[in-house]
Amino acid sequence: MPFGEYPYTIDDKGRVVMPPAFREFVEDGLILTRGMEGCLYAFPLPGWKRVEEQLEGLPLTDAGSRAFVRFFYSGASKARLDNQSRVSIPQTLRAFAGLDSDVIVAGAPGRLEFWNPQRWEAAIAAVQAEPPQPDLLANFVA
């Protein structure tokens, strides 16, 4: 499972160097898509297959399910690391996430997240200011 947060720079062609700690995680390719809270999600291909299975199980008769699947799939883009361990982020996804020149690449269970640094700081500050409710953490073992 990938973990940690790494600040990087996006070049003028929309490429970012993948942190060494995450390269093996995505060595077979990855799927980039819109994430929650205005970030991007990057799933390794095997992980994306599991996500697809879960999304395919959502009811087509539910408007909210259809809207979420549309949001998630329509932004998806397949990518691979180049010979310099860079991943190219499509302009549409960079615009969605507010990524210009700087990015935070963060690990999360089963995926990576690409964040605008200001959004990242705000997301972390929000959790510090108002931690998750105890019932959400009932099964968490520290």
Swiss-Prot record:
GO-annotated cellular components: cytoplasm; nucleoid
Cellular compartments annotated: Cytoplasm, Nucleoid
UniProt superkingdom: Bacteria
Pfam assignment, any one: MraZ
InterPro entries referenced in this protein's UniProt entry, alphabetically: MraZ, MraZ_C, MraZ_dom, MraZ_N, MraZ_sf, SpoVT-AbrB_dom, SpoVT-AbrB_sf
Subunit organization: Forms oligomers.
Organism per entry: Deinococcus radiodurans (strain ATCC 13939 / DSM 20539 / JCM 16871 / CCUG 27074 / LMG 4051 / NBRC 15346 / NCIMB 9279 / VKM B-1422 / R1)
One of the record's GO molecular function terms: transcription cis-regulatory region binding
Protein known as: Transcriptional regulator MraZ
